[in-house]
Amino acid sequence: MEILMSITAGVLFMVGTYLILTKSLLRVVVGLILLSHGAHLLLLTMAGLQRGAPPLLHLEATTYSDPLPQALILTAIVISFGVTSFLLVLAYRTYKEHKTDDLDQLRGSADE
């Protein structure tokens, strides 16, 4: 299962990097979203997957599984949601202002 999750994280990184390098502003935002999802999946995979294991392993509660990776991923998801919404607002305002989402046209020429 961890192999499949690692491959999926790699595919998300690959597609996210490809989309970041394109000319469309919306594709860049989607690429950043996929890159952050790949990072979340990688962190979850690195924590180790235990199918059906409860957080408390015994009733005595002296040994328990580590909740830190899940808390870290939850925090990262909330932060990436805020960054994504901010990037979407910036992309929308840029499109409304310049009437294009092509990064080459937004960059301008050397004469300007």
Curated annotation (Swiss-Prot):
Quaternary organization: Forms a heterooligomeric complex that consists of seven subunits: MrpA, MrpB, MrpC, MrpD, MrpE, MrpF and MrpG.
InterPro entries hit by this protein: CPA3_antiporter_subunitC, NUOK/Mnh_C1-like
Family designation: Belongs to the CPA3 antiporters (TC 2.A.63) subunit C family.
Localization, UniProt: Cell membrane
Keyword Nuclease set for record: no
Keywords annotated in UniProt: Antiport, Cell membrane, Hydrogen ion transport, Ion transport, Membrane, Sodium, Sodium transport, Transmembrane, Transmembrane helix, Transport
Cysteine pairs bridged by disulfides in the record: none
Function of the molecule: Mnh complex is a Na(+)Li(+)/H(+) antiporter involved in Na(+) and/or Li(+) excretion and Na(+) resistance. Na(+)/H(+) antiport consumes a transmembrane electrical potential, and is thus inferred to be electrogenic. Does not transport K(+), Ca(2+) or Mg(2+).
Membrane topology value: Multi-pass membrane protein
Gene3D superfamilies tied to this protein: 1.10.287.3510
Species: Alkalihalophilus pseudofirmus (strain ATCC BAA-2126 / JCM 17055 / OF4) (Bacillus pseudofirmus)
Biological process terms in GO annotation: proton transmembrane transport; sodium ion transport
Single GO cellular component term: plasma membrane
Protein name: Na(+)/H(+) antiporter subunit C
Annotated Pfam families: Oxidored_q2
Entry's Gene Ontology molecular function annotations: antiporter activity
